[in-house]
Amino acid sequence: MTNINRIGLTWISFLSYAFTGALVVVTGMIMGNISNYFHLSISQMSNIFTFLNAGILVSIFINSWLIEIISLKKQLIFSFILTIIAVIGIVLCNSIFLFSINMFILGLVSGITMSIGTFIITHLYSGSKRGSLLLLTDSFFSMSGMIFPIVTAYLLEKKIIWYWSYICIGAIYLLIFLLTINSSFEKFKTNTKNSKETKEKWNFNVFLLSISALLYILGQLGFISWVPQYATEIMNIDIKKTGSLVSGFWMSYMLGMWFFSFIIKFFNLYRMFIFLTSMSTILMYCFIKSENFLNQQYIIISLGFFSSAIYTIIITLASLQTKHPSPKLINLILLFGTIGTFLTFIITSPIVEAKGLYVTLISSNILYGIVFFLSILIYFNKKYEGVI
């Protein structure tokens, strides 16, 4: 494989996460504008966006088998066509039903592309380089989560209608398409053929890592989704200031991924997993207990930094449980992580309604604590099973 081709494939992986990040973050940001457009309440609109998460969930689930039937290149080209259809559908649709279908299609595209992006990195690189590149890939999710809200805010400020945000997001997939048609995917044909021939044995750590992925994502999104309301209603902080908490979290999250992508090669991944989950659990607890807004800003920035590498370390550790990680193994972790995303509002909304915002944040903190204990269990189980 030529170096230019390897770079092109790596950038497809980077942009696959950027596409998903932009979709998820922007969709939440313009919820109020869309609800006004369709004359619905925000609570009704939040249920509609379940279609986006459902699309991601379904596509990651089926992609484990799809990857053995349809080549990666064809999947990416077909996904580009679906993106065009969905974006045009969003622009032209005048009913919430059609909007929901288009969001589901974008979810399907997002899940397939992110799954392919992760698969590419795990098969192009090995060892510590794999971990570093996975962290760098994941950082593009946060990067687009920072850039696109700025773009969206600019568009809304200029009184440009909300669906132009989705047209801008579609431009990311145009770049993926251009890279796809100019790249060779021959290496992956032999990899998927080998994974069919070799029956992969998964150890107990794969199950523990899958549960860790679910609980971590559920805990993270359950926390960060309700922080603005918590700061406004419980801390009595101005709504404009609460935005700095979320943006500070994602900015430090992105910087943390860049930092850990360089230093991860010098540390044992299992011990790093234990350290980061313990620090994140403590920092989240400190944030919830703090009554000073300035302290909360420092704490949430630290939380974003220390929690940034956890999900990628989970994926990397899962890929190291077997000699040749198959698409099914990687997709299993992504599937459980996506289930965590899907369950976020299904689980947290009733808690907010019944027990309030404080208990909801404590629930997220408990989930982080469980992931910390699972990281210790995974470490000792690794030693018992003799995994490298």
From Swiss-Prot:
Domain of life per record: Bacteria
Keywords annotated in UniProt: Cell membrane, Membrane, Transmembrane, Transmembrane helix
Keyword Zinc: no
Family annotation (PROSITE patterns): MFS
InterPro entries: MFS, MFS_dom, MFS_trans_sf, MFS_TsgA, MFS_TsgA-like
Listed transmembrane segments: 11-31, 50-70, 77-97, 101-121, 133-153, 160-180, 206-226, 244-264, 268-288, 298-318, 332-352, 360-380
Gene3D superfamilies registered for this protein in UniProt: MFS general substrate transporter like domains
Residues forming coiled coils: none
Cellular location(s): Cell membrane
Membrane topology term: Multi-pass membrane protein
GO molecular function, one term: transmembrane transporter activity
GO cellular component terms given for this protein: plasma membrane
HAMAP family associated with the record: MFS_TsgA (MF_01044)
Family: Belongs to the major facilitator superfamily. TsgA family.
Protein name: Protein TsgA homolog
Organism of derivation: Buchnera aphidicola subsp. Acyrthosiphon pisum (strain Tuc7)
Gene: tsgA
